[in-house]
Amino acid sequence: MDQNGASGSRPNRLSQGKEAYACERSATVSAAADRSNIINEMAKICEADRQTSAIARRTQVHERLAVANSDFVAVEDLILAYAEPTPEDQVEMIMRDFCSSPTYEEDEDEPSYESEPWFRFRNKRIRTYSRKRDPKSYMAVRTEKSSGTSGLSVQRDLNTSSTSVACDFDAASSQKIHEVLLNLSQYFSATAKASSPTPVPSQIDLPTEARQDSGDECFNAEVENLRDDLLQNGFTFEASIYDNEHEQEDSGKFNVCSDADSTPKKTDVEIAEHKKHLKGPTQAEHVGKEENTNFILEGIPLSEWLTPMEPPKISKDVIKNIPDKKVKLEPSSQKEQKSSKDSNESKIRAASCDITKKNEGTTVLDQPNAAQQENLSNDGDLLEEFLFNEWHPMQCSNGPSTSNDAIKVPKEEINSIKRNDEEQPEKETPNKSRSTSSHQLSFRKTFLKFIEISGEMKIKGEKFVEKVVSGLHHPSHKCNLRTEEYSDNHSQVMESTQRVEFKSALSKPIELLDEKETYDMLAKVEVGEINGKCSPLNNETIAEPEFCGFRTASNKAIPISEKMKIKTAEFMAEFQSKETNHQNDYLVNQPNDNSTSVGRDTAFKKSIEISEEMPTKASKLVVVDTTLGEPHQPKIDPVCSDLNESQFFGFRTASNKAIEITEAMEKRGAMFLAQSRATDQQAEWQPSDFPDIPHTSPKNEIHSINVENTKAVHTKTASETEFFGFRTASNKGIVISENTKKKVAQFMSEFQAADASTDSNKPIVISEESRNIAAKFVDEAATEDSPNKPTFCNVQSQENPLDIEHFKHDLFVERSAKEEHPLCSQPLVRTPRRSQEIHSSLSQLAGQSPLDQATKKSVIARRNLLSLKRKRKIVSSTETSTSCASPAMERFAPKPSSTSTPLADRDLNRSKDCAKNRQDAEDMSPICMQPKKSRRLGLSRSRY
């Protein structure tokens, strides 16, 4: 059954596949037919378009043959006339704009793989203004890279330009540079053998001529520069420096001293002379090499050496030889000067420098020959050019020694030097005539600048040295010589006619009034200094006379001229007169029972103790008349009495000009003094605002004070209660008009208890008598300070004594009533009580404002408008009007000041002062008062 099922299913599958294939074939055929149909349709459309365009062209050609009789232009004509440019035209325009500059370069070769259109700047390159690179530099880098096979570890950056690129060398110079680098590499490889345990083998193929000591390459350039500097400064070379004539040891170590140390090239004559002194085959070989020496490093500065170099460490055992020749440096101007006599120090140094052998820690001096004697004389000449303090200890050896052992010199050599020195005669001081034959000692400002020394200076120097030497052994003789010399100088100064001059800081001569006194003073000062230095009593204290003058910070006495004494006398006289006036005032103000001591006080009112020496010192400077009768005319010192000028005692301006004092000024001064004393006493005895009469004087006695006037002003009695006027800050009287007098009279009448009327509504009637009294009182109080008007001391006039007494009696009655009834002592006429809705600041404005009446009324009207025209509630009753216990304040009582729009003094943090709980309008100003939200009828609105 399975086979039958399988056989039955197979044809079914084939039939299904055939059907599917037929469907797909039909679909492809239909799709191809559709495509062919679309192509045919498109071809038909294109053909139709072609035919229509051809027809249009034919018709257009026919129409153009006709004459245009209208301004009509077809669209096709516009399109043909204004056709867009092709991209090639645009590229040409851009090329003309951007590529016309000479710095523009274009590559002709174009890649073939690019297709049009390509970017128009594909092969375009615009050059900047930089340095043009040399095409040869690439070749130089390649050659360096290929030839750099040496053992030097020089790292180069191929991206940066090397030195060979920066400067073009020829073949010879580049070859020299390479040889130098190879020599340096050999030097470092040779020095590394001793330090490193495993030396690296050298792979450098060096030329035969380059195998020389390392000192030639290390020091040649430095020596050349030193030679040029010395030749420019005027120095010459007579011999070469230490030559490199030592043997090279088997250990491979090198010495620092070499042939390169010699500054100039050796001539043939020098080489021939040098060969005579050589001993050994190695030295001859070095001389032969020296002739063919090539200065490889000549012309290359040290700054271009990239590798730092350090000389190798050399032990003292290797160096055993020292050259015979020495070098001598001296200025060319003194080249021919030679001396046959040397000093002891120069011989010792020359002997110590001639050490040639060192055996078992001791040194032996060679026997001096002719060449060494010549060297000794040359060294003596060289050492004479330097000062003694510029000499430095030196040790001459075959090379740089690190030991600090002293060099032993045999005693026989030193004794022979001393004997030769004793046999030689003493040196004489060189003069200008002998300057050509011997070296002269000189002083130098800098290394090459010398100070010229004249013959007089040399003679003075010799005398000074002799005095110093003699003074070291005989100090008493030295002191006597100095005293004799100073006395001779003093006699020469007194006898000579030469003028002694003093110069200021700007080198200007100062004129001397008395030249003789100046000579005497200088001689005394010099003799005093000599006596002070030479006297045996220097250690003992000598009592100097006490100086009672003034001294500077350096303890120099200040001379006091006659003008200074006169000014001091004037000042002391004025000071004494002021002091006596203050003492008199103090005595007047003090009670008679207590006795006061007159003296000087400090700023803290502490008495100054005056000793007995202080008056004597003061009397030596200034003599002051202490009499009180004429304090402005002091007695001047008799020294100043012979002056013809009249002395001025007064006031002066800032430019020291005298101020003339007129009679009016004197009167005003007297008035001011009397007023100040009266006010002081009034403030001390009765410190009340108004003049009071003491309770202990029932008869109204008037106390008076005697005032002294120094300028013919008679003393007058002034009472305590005289002055009632007004003055400015400069103590000038204020003129009071009639209107002001009436107001003052009205003001004063309010304080008088005329009638004991209890009716508060009854108007007050001011009598004519009280008005006259007040007016006269004000007239007298407001008088100006002029010589035509009487002074305030005479306020108690003789015309109206009864009026003044009556006024004082009224004041006394009023004050006695206040003391008996303190509660009823308020004035009867008061302002109405303040309303509970008006702030105190507005009441202050009404009472204390300096405005006139009209302005006050306008301000009050404005206040009423802002407060909604609330009327003031006058709370009054018979009890408050009749009784004296009214809590209201007086009209003119002092009140606290406030701002224009004050607020109530409240604390917002407290609950009772919060705005929610506050409902009274008196807590705020009427300007800032909140409106009351009450129910209103009709169309009325709130003003806020």
Curated annotation (Swiss-Prot):
<feature type="compositionally biased region" description="Basic residues">
    <location>
        <begin position="932"/>
        <end position="944"/>
    </location>
</feature>
<keyword id="KW-0234">DNA repair</keyword>
<dbReference type="GO" id="GO:0006355">
    <property type="term" value="P:regulation of DNA-templated transcription"/>
</dbReference>
<dbReference type="InterPro" id="IPR002093">
    <property type="entry name" value="BRCA2_repeat"/>
</dbReference>
<dbReference type="InterPro" id="IPR015525">
    <property type="entry name" value="BRCA2"/>
</dbReference>
<keyword id="KW-0539">Nucleus</keyword>
<feature type="repeat" description="BRCA2 2">
    <location>
        <begin position="644"/>
        <end position="678"/>
    </location>
</feature>
<protein>
    <recommendedName>
        <fullName>Breast cancer type 2 susceptibility protein homolog</fullName>
    </recommendedName>
</protein>
<feature type="region of interest" description="Disordered">
    <location>
        <begin position="823"/>
        <end position="854"/>
    </location>
</feature>
<feature type="region of interest" description="Disordered">
    <location>
        <begin position="415"/>
        <end position="440"/>
    </location>
</feature>
<feature type="compositionally biased region" description="Basic and acidic residues">
    <location>
        <begin position="904"/>
        <end position="921"/>
    </location>
</feature>
<dbReference type="GO" id="GO:0043150">
    <property type="term" value="P:DNA synthesis involved in double-strand break repair via homologous recombination"/>
</dbReference>
<dbReference type="GO" id="GO:0051301">
    <property type="term" value="P:cell division"/>
</dbReference>
<comment type="subunit">
    <text>Interacts with Rad9 and spn-A/Rad51.</text>
</comment>
<keyword id="KW-0469">Meiosis</keyword>
<dbReference type="GO" id="GO:0005634">
    <property type="term" value="C:nucleus"/>
</dbReference>
<feature type="repeat" description="BRCA2 1">
    <location>
        <begin position="543"/>
        <end position="577"/>
    </location>
</feature>
<dbReference type="GO" id="GO:0051598">
    <property type="term" value="P:meiotic recombination checkpoint signaling"/>
</dbReference>
<feature type="compositionally biased region" description="Polar residues">
    <location>
        <begin position="838"/>
        <end position="852"/>
    </location>
</feature>
<dbReference type="GO" id="GO:1901563">
    <property type="term" value="P:response to camptothecin"/>
</dbReference>
<feature type="region of interest" description="Disordered">
    <location>
        <begin position="325"/>
        <end position="354"/>
    </location>
</feature>
<keyword id="KW-0677">Repeat</keyword>
<feature type="compositionally biased region" description="Polar residues">
    <location>
        <begin position="876"/>
        <end position="885"/>
    </location>
</feature>
<feature type="region of interest" description="Disordered">
    <location>
        <begin position="876"/>
        <end position="944"/>
    </location>
</feature>
<feature type="repeat" description="BRCA2 3">
    <location>
        <begin position="719"/>
        <end position="753"/>
    </location>
</feature>
<comment type="function">
    <text>Involved in and required for double-strand break repair by meiotic and mitotic homologous recombination. During meiosis, has a dual role in the repair of meiotic double-stranded breaks and the efficient activation of the meiotic recombination checkpoint.</text>
</comment>
<feature type="compositionally biased region" description="Basic and acidic residues">
    <location>
        <begin position="325"/>
        <end position="348"/>
    </location>
</feature>
<keyword id="KW-0132">Cell division</keyword>
<feature type="compositionally biased region" description="Basic and acidic residues">
    <location>
        <begin position="415"/>
        <end position="431"/>
    </location>
</feature>
<dbReference type="GO" id="GO:0010778">
    <property type="term" value="P:meiotic DNA repair synthesis involved in reciprocal meiotic recombination"/>
</dbReference>
<keyword id="KW-0498">Mitosis</keyword>
<keyword id="KW-0227">DNA damage</keyword>
<keyword id="KW-0131">Cell cycle</keyword>
